[in-house]
Amino acid sequence: LAIMSLILIAWTSFNNFWAVACEGKRLDEIGIGDGLVPETGLKKESPEKRIAMYPKVPPSLLSKEPEGIILGKYKNRYVRIPINEIYHHCILGGSGSGKTSTVLLDTLLANFATGRNGFQTFCIDIKGEIHEKSTYAYDENVLVCNPTDRTSCGWDAYYRLHGNPSDDLIIEAIEEISQALIISTNPKDNFFVENARTMFTGLLIYYFKQGENFIDSVNKILETETKSLIAEIISDSEPSDLHYKYLAKFAGRKNESIEDCMSEMTTSLSVFSKSDIKFMFRDNYQKASPYSFQEGKSIFLAIPEHMLESYKAILRLCTVQTLKEMERRSEEETTPILLIIDEFGRLGRMEGIFNALSTLRSKKVSVMLAFQSLAQCEVIYSKEETRVLTENCRVKVVCECADGET
């Protein structure tokens, strides 16, 4: 036994010496068990290159216990951003590269499954697997909104308009909805997009004043010929009415550009004609909203991946309303909130994301954007805007990179 032990010690010592001398491995990288299997090959990297490529992790980022934003492991310790350090993050990597299964899932597991609940979260959960794996079923502090699952929560788009809201609040809340649902995919379309938003805002204000809820208002817009609807509303309105200034300029117009604006509006709203969406926004008795965070809740927007293209307007609406509400959050709040926007590059343009990244750190709100590459992001945002997005994210995690510019 003694001879075997001596042979084993000699074998591992030789292999570790070889790894240091010929492979460029650092002495402080040698751990228990290293050297049992020899590292083959001659010197591939100089010690200087290895130090540059694999720098030591600062002790402040290391933890024995999983907590905060989990980035990985180093020498049997977790590499994490402490929960009290509020940074924005972007996670890049193609499909199957581990964006969801590593940083996103590990971070949420460390928060919910361990029972720490150090932060609340708003998470876009493509496939619906994140909340299933990271939270306990029937947790009263976790709200799951899934338009394809009628046992989940709905969404209250008019959450700010209950009671007796002022005219200014009505306009502000409805303009947020318009900006989220009707978006530009081409800078040349700005004229049509802006006018479609104005038209939609005016019609929503009119129906809200008539006592209609959000989903019924949208479907009345979809079910009626827009030009005749606006003409009828204006003929029965006074210039002092709240909706009048939004709709008057469209009444009686017959040029083709107005028709294009109307088409832009109805195309953007077509998803609300589906029965699952009507149930989510109207009939579901339990609805989540950005006010749910004030009650200590976390929200997961879950959706099957094959439905993402059809329902991305819904995800965008809920996300933009949440971003705007976070901007109104008091700086005195002590509980951090983590906003996870998975598949950010596939959701369409979010106007509020730039302000969010610029202002939310002071509100103890951290934004985490996950997308495939800068090239994917530049399909929606300009090259300069994409640079602004990434520069505002202090922590960048690259799981995979095939695009040279990324």
Language-model-derived ranges and their functions:
Residues 384-406:
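Conserved P-loop NTPase catalytic core
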Residues 125-127, 370-374, 401-403:
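A short beta-strand-to-loop transition that corresponds to the Sensor-1 phosphate-sensing loop
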